[in-house]
Every structure is written in C-alpha cells, then in structure tokens.
Design a protein with these regions (language model features):
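Residue-level signal for tight coil/turn positions that link beta-strands
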Residues: 58-59, 82
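Short aromatic-glycine-enriched beta-strand elements
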Residues: 60-65
Length: 100
C-alpha cells in the first residue's frame, strides 16, 4: 500500500458558487469536479457517507476518489448515481496536488 499526501488550499466558495441555492445538483457537482473541491456525500439508499474528490463526472453519475476522513489518504473509488445522493456537503477546500 502506498500513502499519498494530499496538498490542499482553503478557498472562498462564494467565488465559485455565487448563487448556489439556485443551482441544480449536477451544476454544483460539475463545478466541484472542475475545481477539485472536496465533497462529502450521504447516500439515501445505503445510508453510507463518502468523502473525497470527483474524478469523473457526467450528468447521471460520478466517480469519487474517496479519502479516509481520519487519515486523509485515498482509500477507494466509488461510482455514485447522482439521483441517489440525499445530502451533498461542499467543503471550502481545494486539492492542489497529491504527493506519491
């Protein structure tokens, strides 16, 4: 197993999402993907939580590169169907790079 250190930077979400309350979830996810913003999901069907960055995006699903919240290292990749997301938390943190 390799441990990857994740370099992050605090960001101002209002600059990226000036009117987030009027945006569709797909628009929010796309901006998170484009800007490598950390996200936190809760699944309605599986009652599970996932935390990480979006590696791939389309209008129906995303591929999430999961980060362990305790250790801060990548642990898995998950496919998430957008309509199954019950809660989406957008963090004010952007991933700048990953040291290998």
């Amino acid at each position: 197993d390799r441990i990857n250190l994740i370099e992050t930077k605090d960001i101002n979400l209002e600059e990226i999402f000036p009117n987030i309350v009027k945006m569709k979830i797909e628009e929010v996810l796309k901006k998170c993907f484009e800007n490598k913003i950390l996200v936190h999901f809760e699944h309605e069907k599986s009652y599970s939580e996932k935390f990480g960055i979006i590696e791939r995006f389309d209008n129906e699903k995303i591929i999430l590169k999961e980060i362990d919240k305790m250790t801060g290292i990548f642990i898995a990749k998950s496919e998430i169907i957008i309509e199954d997301i019950s809660f989406l938390f957008v963090r004010n943190c952007k991933v700048l790079g990953i040291e290998r």
